[in-house]
Amino acid sequence: QETVTEPEFSEPVYSNISKDYTINLSWHQVTNQDANENIYRVLADTKGLTTISPTWFFLSDNDGGIESLASQEYVNHCHQNGVEVWGLVEDIRHKDTIKDLEIFSRTSSRQKLVSNLIAQAIQYDLDGINLDMEFINEESARAYIEFVRELSIMCRLNGIVLSIDNYVPAAHNLFYNRKEQGIVADYVIIMGYDEHFAGGEPGSVASLEYVKRGIEQTLLEVPKEKVINALPFYTRVWTEMEDGTVSSEAMGIERAKNWVEENQIELY
């Protein structure tokens, strides 16, 4: 009787890109082509920046299509100033017409999305791709991670850094699977803000304990050399109305400082 021996299964080995310097990254909100011109002012007004991530790519349909605002002039100017460009891709702009589950659960749409992103990265000489998928849920989470694996392979083959944005770890978002992200991605970025947000209860945007917890919880699953923590350069001023309703206004650091002085508020 012939004995058939099953081949031993071996986990794939994912190599990673790791920078030999501290990454000082800023996201740059770009809503149209004209907004790309702001990069001249952004770099002129910023010190110590190593990396910028413009919001350039938007999931546009359920078949892996993307909308792009990429600019060669933008990339060239950043490179001339020693700043890397990691193009951000998100699922927010067209959230009413796209479905993450449909995009990520089909091999054909995942492959098309990967191909589209890699093509844009090569065409515009991008240094990296930054994933900002904020509407993943338990149903789409496994398919999303499969997409992340497939994208990471193509990024690695083309020398493109892959970073992934994540909420501060909490029970309601554990399905993002940071452990697997920490294996296949080059960097895992904690969005260490929005502890309290517009429409919610008043409170800090990013209290010390909240930020600390986000970092510590992420480090339980992701190698420390891959973790980047993002801090807000804004705060919120909360106003409670007579009827008990609450509203808030986001303010940048300079404006918030002026507001405190104008209202003679003592900080502690």
Task: Cite the ranges covered by each PLM segment.
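Glycan-binding loop/region signatures in secreted carbohydrate-active enzymes
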Residues: 3-11, 235-268
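Mature extracellular/periplasmic domains of secretome proteins
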Residues: 40-46, 175-184, 220
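Active-site region of glycoside hydrolase catalytic domains
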Residues: 187-190, 196, 212-240
